[in-house]
């Protein structure tokens, strides 16, 4: 009599097989490819810009590197990094421009980096700006890929590198640092990681005054999530409360330093920056030649139309169940 053949006992569910391991490796490789394309595309746009700058600098006999790290706002940030706050310039018309108009995170990074690397604060500013540019492109890619797929993510990252004033991304300015913090904060919102979103938003609030828009976005996203899920997560509440702390802390610091609760806004007003409900924009458009004015109005109208279309289509929307922007029937657990 032949012996019965016993069936093989199945591997435990947690034991990886060669096929399973290979599949995971393939998935990771495929996930890295679009990200590499996004970052490579962004770097290419910046290298083209730097190449043009080098050609112009050589033709005019000027120092191109100095234009990147030693002009306009860059000078103010370097002075803060090296000497702290307290510098003012009085204009011929009597207006006073104070360095308190500039937020502290970027010069703090310049100061810290120049302390550990053999570079001055101005060069450290370029290192921060260029590194943050890559981080921003990565974050923009993640947001786009989460909402619309990998192709959308790649296109968004590259387009950010070629928008009309993208040249400042190559300078020792705060645009790249702020954009990186904003992009990753919004990505954290999309993933339901509210505490991470709040912390990144708070850091953005120490970088630029435009963080108020990011603070509003985090708050609105939380409200939408509460309406859709009909519950409030403690992590969501914590993230929303943390989000404005950076911006509020600096505004309070300026107020205490200058002994006036409106000191920060007074400083900004002296620089010609204020919220006027669009009056300054209307005056700017009215002062343009008619062709330029017409083109700008058409662009603004198209932008408004695009916003309407996005709202009608329910954008942004993702199929991921971890997103607060999923269909209302999807249950989401907020995470930090």
Residue ranges and their predicted role:
Residues 104, 108, 116-135, 292-293:
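Loop-to-helix entry region of an early transmembrane alpha helix in multi-pass inner-membrane enzymes
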Residues 112, 127-147, 304-308:
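Transmembrane-helix motifs of polytopic, lipid-linked glycan transferases
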